[in-house]
Amino acid sequence: MKLMQFQIDDIIKSALLEDINYVDVTTDYLIDEDDISTAKYVSKDEGILCGIEVALRVFQLLDDGVTCRIFINDGEAVKKGDIIAEFTGHTKALLKGERTALNLSQHMSGVATATNRCVKLVEGTKASIADTRKTLPGLRVLQKYAVTVGGGRNHRYNLSDCAMLKDTHLDAYGSMTNAVNVLRERMGHTVKIEVEVGNLEELQEALDLGVEVIMLDNMSCEDMTKAVEITAGRAKLEASGNVTAETIRKIAETGVDIISLGALTHSVKAFDISMKMS
């Protein structure tokens, strides 16, 4: 996944408006308009870097003359004490953009780091690590980019990407079989269908319907192993629910194709980065 400038500019502008409003009473009253400084991004954590270009864009939207020397790129490992980048430009722009740039890059690096840890935990199995739509409102494009930087895969970006019958849809509509048949009649032929199942009986119904992806929701590892055997490659199997660092390896070893985690985006720990002025 590649970030496009038009995708991130609106996010950054909204964040800057939220933080600066119409004046930075500290910076605007202390710093001369023509004052130039260099700001160093320094890591205080260990993991996978993500969001350095986003941080640069924050400063450039405040001062289009800001330049950057990047020493560590998105997707590369970073450790405590590493100098990640140096930004040079008007001091006012660097100070005003500091918190927004750090908030975004720290969060994105946290997502990438958490994803990478999960990827490493399932190495040697066929399972891929995927995100969900449990993203923070307004930040989905940045979070999903960070997941790919960490070595994970993107699930649906939005509701138009794939038809996904969850328990709430089936509770509201009724029969899984009827729902799948109606969807096939009404939607485009290129759209895939994923169905959420909670037991092996529902799995068999989904397989009989020929859906492309089946989500195994909160199933035991024993039942997931049986589900893999029953499916025998006829559909992609996605494990979801109660996935933790302690359980993810056992889940992967059942033979599922995908393990999806909402925790990669909805509650990730921010990566610690500081900015030093000179």
Where are these regions (language model features)?
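Acidic/glycine-rich phosphate/pyrophosphate-binding loops and surrounding catalytic core
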Residues: 2-209, 213, 225-230, 236-238, ...
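Active-site loop ensemble at the mouth of alpha/beta enzyme cores that anchors a bound cofactor
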Residues: 274-278
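Short secondary-structure boundary segments
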Residues: 218, 241, 263-264
